[in-house]
Each structure stands twice: as C-alpha cells, then as structure tokens.
Swiss-Prot record:
It is found in: Cytoplasm. The lineage of its organism: Bacteria, Pseudomonadati, Pseudomonadota, Gammaproteobacteria, Moraxellales. GO terms for molecular function: nickel cation binding; unfolded protein binding. It comes from Acinetobacter baylyi (strain ATCC 33305 / BD413 / ADP1). The keyword Cytoplasm applies. This is Urease accessory protein UreE. InterPro entries: UreE, UreE_C_dom, UreE_N, UreE_N_sf. The gene is ureE.
Length: 159
C-alpha cells in the first residue's frame, strides 16, 4: 500500500498525478485510508498542518503524487429572497460555530435538523442537496507563522 506522507504547495505543470475525492470529514484528518478509482488502496500519514482543501496535492516518499478533490456529500442548502436574509442566517449559524460554506446565493452546512429548523424559523428556505463542501476556514484557522515564545532581551542585568 502506498503511504502519502507529504503535502505539496505546488507541482510542475507537466507532473502526472492521480485524483481522489474525499469528504470534508476525511480531509480534516492527517491519517486516513482510501481507495482510488482504479481500486488501489492507499494510506495517508500527513503532517498536522490543517485541512486538505480541494485541489491540494500530497505525495509519497517515492514521488507518487495525488490531487485531493472535495467529494460531493449530503449538505443543507440555505437560500433567501434577499441578501440581508442570507446574511442574517450566516450570522446565526456562525454563532453556533458550525462549519459553514458561503457562496453569493446560498449557505451550506452539514445535515442538522435543529439548525435547519432554526433557519427556517427565520424565514429562509432549507433543502438537502449533494454538493462538495469547502467551509470557511474562520478567523482562527491555521496559518503559517510561528507562535513560539521568542527570546526577550532583558532590560536589566540579572545576576
């Protein structure tokens, strides 16, 4: 079984690769198993550096490359008659800290009948659909600078 252990920021334009569709739940994990469309089983043991976004590339130590795509999955789609109503729904869903995908004309979240009823109570339309899920990463998402303490120069000489 091939084990993918590296995340790649980019690949050469002439590089060949296979593709694999994964749900959002799987793309959040650093370790998983999956089956390619040709029936080959693979494993992933990746650095814990955040979610695999659709279009991300991972590689084995031997140089095999795999592009990860978002797999369509069951989601709740919220639509509204006005932009303001949609904005209001996004506010209320955001207050519940659920993964939420925003588009200009709809909001998407993982199936949850309590949240669906809340949004319907605000006067919006909710229906279950199959759609790829790429929720917003949020203000506190993983980013690339170091938060370790840096040495502080002493203002006073200490004995």
């Amino acid at each position: 079984m091939k084990i993918y252990t590296q995340r790649l920021d980019e690949i050469a334009s002439d590089q060949t690769f296979e593709t694999l569709e994964l749900t959002f739940d799987t793309r959040q994990k650093s370790r998983f198993r999956a089956t390619l469309t040709n029936g080959t089983d693979i494993g992933a043991d990746l650095p814990r550096t955040g979610i695999l976004r659709s279009g991300s590339f991972i590689a084995t130590n031997e140089g095999d490359i795999l592009r990860i795509d978002a797999k369509p999955e069951q989601l709740m789609q919220v639509t509204a008659k006005t932009d303001f109503e949609l904005l209001k729904a996004a506010y209320h869903l955001g207050n519940r800290h659920v993964p939420l995908m925003l588009t200009p004309y709809a909001l998407y979240f993982e199936p949850d009948h309590v949240l669906a009823e809340m949004v319907e109570g605000l006067g919006l339309q909710v229906k279950q659909v199959e759609h790829a899920f790429e929720p917003e990463s949020g203000a506190y998402a993983q980013h690339n600078h170091d938060h370790r303490l840096s040495p502080i120069k002493s203002l006073h000489h200490v004995h």
